[in-house]
């Protein structure tokens, strides 16, 4: 055997030469040898490396070795060579016993003492290191033997047990069920049971026919054990076990309930055909009834079963509704803090929230407030489910009060780095601020405008975020006490350049449509007029108007020639007539500022305004066209340009319009155009006006001199309103008739991707025409109508003629309200009327809540 110097024992610092040291005596060498590990370890046991001791005694390592300089500390006496030999002999003789003690301790006789070879408690011996894998090997062999024994035993016992389970004596059946339950706890016998269809059928039969508690517990416990294996699930399903298990959901015994619901849960998760079988057996009703229990882990399993059954199945959703499921689910969200239960319950609510029947039930049960309680939960999956559900519900909750906590929480989560969280929060805020002044004020007071501006700035080109955020801002910047403040906040928060930039490509038409409405509202603030112009808003609006007008003219030419509607009539679900109306309406507000009028005039857009007066089938376009001409005609040169474009004839015809707004604007423009005419012409013109149905009161004319009246676009009637609710769902139809109609959305929404989620779409059709993707809730006919399925991105209320028929081919027209002729004056054109106080009154689609 050779010895090697350990690598960490260096002699480089030894000041003495070993050749100068005297040779120690044999006794001294023996004593120094005793200090090595051979004294306590043969080397075979520990595997320690032997080494030559230092003869100089000057090793640095030895200076710290207490055994080198304090012999009494390690040993109480010196050992002679004979004693060392005796110890080595004893260790050799007991080597086999040490190995046996480590590997087969059960074979040793009691009372035998085996000398230990472990010198250092921190260093296990070689035998000790081998002991653990040896024990594992031994147990594996034993288990293999026992497994085979269990399998053989079960195989031999199964035929007899089947007979006993079918016995008429219930005591015998009970004993047999308990025996089978015990066998099913072992893997080998469990496989033997599930491989026997006769045994599983006997268990199901015993479960169905017996009223004995022990029999029931044994049989259902066995089925529960089998349900952890796919083969067992198939055997239970084929044996008709699901109806028997559903029946047990009425059991008052906790253990039976646990076995039954967990077995059904496993079947629903992994066995094809189980969902239908559970529905047919009445499982939904029984599961909803179980929601009244208070064991959180049990409830988590029940709610997960409900989610599996309701997902993608409208009938199941209606059964849950009929069983008062929504109120129980909301109660759970309000009462517990167990994360898994809250998560599974929120998943059920998310599935139900796209059902038009369940949606109002959840809202009425306080679902919005209950879900809002968990927006600050550290569980991200719970927060996301709550947000998806809230967004699905939000179009049905536009009239719900007491949402201050929710609105504040939504503003907070707008700062999240998760794109899905921000998208949902913005969409919910958009819907909840639609036609609800209280919610608008609340959002403004908690910093919602600043948060939404920041969200738009940070979103970049993510339209799934920018579109709902722009819609929410559009609602917050008009028709409530804090609207003027909101308009200023957008400017002070550096939002104007970002918002105007969204009018450029690659923005899609639904987003552009929403931005146009927001710019119109922002222009209501005089301080925003110049910044909007400086950021290029007028130029971009005119460019969009040209594009939309060309497409509209092309469509009308095609319809006139062959009666067909070309594919290009819609772009991303948005009709170009909507863009025409929106851009002209925004230019109308911007034209109130003198320099803006000059810029608009220079864009060579007046001919288009005049041509729009001929859109007899779309009153709202006629109204905004007459409105912008009314503003531009303040300048005499522009009035002459308008007359030169041939506007006199269509304006004169519009004086007979049943829409007071159209008629009044037309009269105002004609009066401006007649300012340089003779006094006789003016008097004759005034006289003709008083003969029209809309202008019958002579007292309003102030001796034949026409002033300029208020902006009639905000004088509105409480007729059907188009609510631009932001939601998700397939393409929908905006109908001007009918009661509550909520959009049918998707059962669930992708968490990892927003692809395929059409957020926003085109305008609706008052004639029942298809809209673009992205259903939103909208208010139905008359003030009592509920939110319906309309499209997002803004649109107008459906204008109705005096005969009650729609006057617009798309859902964006709006008539002005009935007025006495004496109320019509033309004083103070620059004075804007107060916002309507009735939430059911809305302006054209580009106004706040459309």
From Swiss-Prot:
Region (Disordered): 1-24, 756-850
Pfam families, A to Z: Arm (PF00514)
CC annotations in GO: adherens junction; catenin complex; cytoplasm; nucleus
Key words of the record: Cell adhesion, Cell junction, Cell membrane, Cytoplasm, Developmental protein, Membrane, Repeat, Segmentation polarity protein, Wnt signaling pathway
Chief localisation class: cytoplasm
Molecular function (Gene Ontology), one example: nuclear receptor binding
Keyword Lipoprotein set for record: no
Tagged with keyword NAD: no
Record-linked InterPro entries: ARM-like, ARM-type_fold, Armadillo, Beta-catenin
GO biological process: canonical Wnt signaling pathway; cell-cell adhesion; positive regulation of transcription by RNA polymerase II; segment polarity determination
Domain of life where this protein originates: Eukaryota
Membrane protein topology class: Peripheral membrane protein
Localization: Cytoplasm; Cell membrane; Cell junction, Adherens junction
Entry's family note: Belongs to the beta-catenin family.
PANTHER family: ARMADILLO SEGMENT POLARITY PROTEIN
Name of this protein: Armadillo segment polarity protein
Lineage, broadest ranks: Eukaryota, Metazoa, Ecdysozoa, Arthropoda, Hexapoda
């Amino acid at each position: 055997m050779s010895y090697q110097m350990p690598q960490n024992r260096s002699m480089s610092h030894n000041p003495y030469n070993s050749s100068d040291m005297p040779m120690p005596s044999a006794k001294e060498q023996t004593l120094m040898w005793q200090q090595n590990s051979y004294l306590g370890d043969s080397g075979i046991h520990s595997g320690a490396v032997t080494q030559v001791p230092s003869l100089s005694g000057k090793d640095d390592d030895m200076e710290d070795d207490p055994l080198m300089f304090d012999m009494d500390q390690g040993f109480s006496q010196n050992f002679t060579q004979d004693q060392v030999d005796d110890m080595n002999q004893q260790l050799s003789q007991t080597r086999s016993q040490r190995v046996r003690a480590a590997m087969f301790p059960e074979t040793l006789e009691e009372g035998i003492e085996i000398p230990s070879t472990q010198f250092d408690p921190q260093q296990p011996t070689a035998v000790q290191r081998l002991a653990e894998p040896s024990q594992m090997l031994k147990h594996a062999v034993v288990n293999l033997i026992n497994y085979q024994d269990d399998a053989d035993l079960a195989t031999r016992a199964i035929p007899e047990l089947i007979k006993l389970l079918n016995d008429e004596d219930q005591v015998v059946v009970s004993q047999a069920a308990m025996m089978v339950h015990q066998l099913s706890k072992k893997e080998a016998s469990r496989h033997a049971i599930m491989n026997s269809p006769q045994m599983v059928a006997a268990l199901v039969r015993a479960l169905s026919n017996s009223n004995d508690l022990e029999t029931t517990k044994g049989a259902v416990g066995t089925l529960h054990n089998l349900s952890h294996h796919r083969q067992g699930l198939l055997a239970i399903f084929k044996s008709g076990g699901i109806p028997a298990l559903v029946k047990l959901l009425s059991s008052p015994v906790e253990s039976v309930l646990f076995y039954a619901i967990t077995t059904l849960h496993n079947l629903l998760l992994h066995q094809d055909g189980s969902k239908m079988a559970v529905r047919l057996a009445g499982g939904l009703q029984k599961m909803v009834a179980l929601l009244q229990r208070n064991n959180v882990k049990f409830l988590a399993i029940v709610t997960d079963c409900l989610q599996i059954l309701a997902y993608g199945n409208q009938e199941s959703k209606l059964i849950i509704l009929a069983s008062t499921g929504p109120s129980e689910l909301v109660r759970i969200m309000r009462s517990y803090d167990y994360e898994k239960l809250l998560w599974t319950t929120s998943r059920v609510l998310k599935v139900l929230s796209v059902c038009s029947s369940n949606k109002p039930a959840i809202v009425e049960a306080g679902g919005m407030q209950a879900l809002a309680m968990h927006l600050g939960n550290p569980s991200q999956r719970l927060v996301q489910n709550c947000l998806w559900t809230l967004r699905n519900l939000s179009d049905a909750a536009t009239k719900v009060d007491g949402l201050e906590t929710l609105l504040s929480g939504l503003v907070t989560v707008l700062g999240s780095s998760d794109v899905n969280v921000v998208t949902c929060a913005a969409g919910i805020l958009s819907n909840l601020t639609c036609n609800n002044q209280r919610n608008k004020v609340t959002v403004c007071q908690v910093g919602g405008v600043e948060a939404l501006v920041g969200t738009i700035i940070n979103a970049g080109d993510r339209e799934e975020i920018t579109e709902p955020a722009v819609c929410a801002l559009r609602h917050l910047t008009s028709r409530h006490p804090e609207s003027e403040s909101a308009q200023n906040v957008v400017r002070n928060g550096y939002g104007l350049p970002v918002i105007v930039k969204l009018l450029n490509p690659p923005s899609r038409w639904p987003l552009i449509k929403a931005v146009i409405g927001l710019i119109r509202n922002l222009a209501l603030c005089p301080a925003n007029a110049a910044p909007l112009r400086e950021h290029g808003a007028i130029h971009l609006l005119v460019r969009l108007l040209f594009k939309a007008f060309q497409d509209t003219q092309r469509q009308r030419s095609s319809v006139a020639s062959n009666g067909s509607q070309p594919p290009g009539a819609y772009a991303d679900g948005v009709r170009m007539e909507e863009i025409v109306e929106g851009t002209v309406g925004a230019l109308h507000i911007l034209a109130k500022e003198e320099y803006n009028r000059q810029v608009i005039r220079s864009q060579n857009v007046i001919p288009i305004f005049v041509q729009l007066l001929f859109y007899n089938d779309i009153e709202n376009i006629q109204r905004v066209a007459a409105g912008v001409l009314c503003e531009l005609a303040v300048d005499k040169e522009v009035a002459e340009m308008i007359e030169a474009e041939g506007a006199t004839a269509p304006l004169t015809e519009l004086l007979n319009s049943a829409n007071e707004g159209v008629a009044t604007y037309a009269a105002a423009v004609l009066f401006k155009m007649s300012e340089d005419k003779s006094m006789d012409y003016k008097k004759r013109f005034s006289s003709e006006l008083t003969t029209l149905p809309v202008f019958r009161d002579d007292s309003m004319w102030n001796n034949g001199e026409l002033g300029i009246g208020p902006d009639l676009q905000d004088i509105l009637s409480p007729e059907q309103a188009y609510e631009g609710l932001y939601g998700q769902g397939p393409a929908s139809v905006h109908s001007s008739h009918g009661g509550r109609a909520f959009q049918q959305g998707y059962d669930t929404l992708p968490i990892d991707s927003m692809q395929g989620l059409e957020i926003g779409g085109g305008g609706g059709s008052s004639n029942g025409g298809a809209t673009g993707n992205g259903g939103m809730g909208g208010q139905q006919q008359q003030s009592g109508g509920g939110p319906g399925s309309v499209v997002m991105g803004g649109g107008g209320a459906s204008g109705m003629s005096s005969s009650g028929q729609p006057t617009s081919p798309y859902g964006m027209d709006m008539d002005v309200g009935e007025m006495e002729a004496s109320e019509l004056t033309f004083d103070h054109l620059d004075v804007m009327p107060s916002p309507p106080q009735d939430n059911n009154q809305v302006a054209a689609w580009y106004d706040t809540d459309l």
